[in-house]
Each structure stands twice: as C-alpha cells, then as structure tokens.
C-alpha cells in the first residue's frame, strides 16, 4: 500500500513560511549547541535542564505549527480529492505519536 506522504512536499508553503520554519529550527540548533557547551563546561545541572525544557517547548511549537498547517492544507486537499480517509488516518497516527512525547 502506498503511503500518502511519499510524493508530498511543502509546495503550499510560501518562501516566507519556509524561511520562518528554517529560522526557528536554526535558533533551536543554536540552543542545543549551547546546551552541549554547558555540559562540556560542567554547568549546574538545573541550568542545563532549564535550557533543555526551553528547547523541548520550541520544538513542540514548530511541530504544532506544522501539524496545523498539514491539517489545513494537505489533509483538506486530500479530502477534496476523495483521498480523505487515508489522510485523516495518517494525521491521527502522527497526532498520537506527537502526544506521546
């Protein structure tokens, strides 16, 4: 059975939206490198944990944005084209994985 997402891309995203997501991820990458430096420099564990929590929150925000965008565009388009059942099933699977974290 072919997966719904094998041929899908972020085509519906504007260049500005892609840049915003990329910039968010680059900031998160910088935060993670900062955490790595904190560990290497034997910083206080609580300070490191606070930074890890901030990274987790930032990643969750990016994921929520992508999840919302996917529902509004990809899933909605699939429903309109008659392929909604598979798209909804895929969305629910992703949502279940997302809520486990």
UniProtKB/Swiss-Prot annotation:
The keyword Cytoplasm applies. GO terms for cellular component: cytoplasm; protein-DNA complex. It is found in: Cytoplasm. Changing residue 90 to A: Abolishes negative regulation of DNA binding, without significantly interfering with the Cu(1+) affinity or coordination geometry. It comes from the Bacteria. Belongs to the CsoR family. Copper-sensitive repressor that has a key role in copper homeostasis. Negatively regulates expression of the copZA operon and of cutJ/ycnJ. In the absence of copper ions, binds with high affinity to the copZA promoter and represses the transcription. In the presence of copper ions, CsoR binds Cu(1+), which significantly decreases its DNA binding affinity and leads to the transcription of the genes. This is Copper-sensing transcriptional repressor CsoR.
């Amino acid at each position: 059975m072919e997966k719904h997402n094998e041929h899908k891309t972020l085509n519906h995203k504007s260049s500005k939206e892609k840049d915003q997501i990329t910039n968010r991820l680059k900031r998160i990458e910088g935060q993670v490198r900062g955490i790595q430096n904190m560990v290497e420099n034997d910083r206080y564990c609580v300070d490191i944990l606070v930074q890890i929590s901030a990274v987790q929150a930032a990643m969750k925000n990016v994921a929520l944005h992508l999840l919302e965008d996917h529902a509004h565009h990809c899933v909605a388009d699939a429903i309109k084209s008659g392929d909604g059942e598979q798209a909804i099933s895929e969305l629910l699977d992703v949502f279940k994985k997302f809520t486990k974290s």
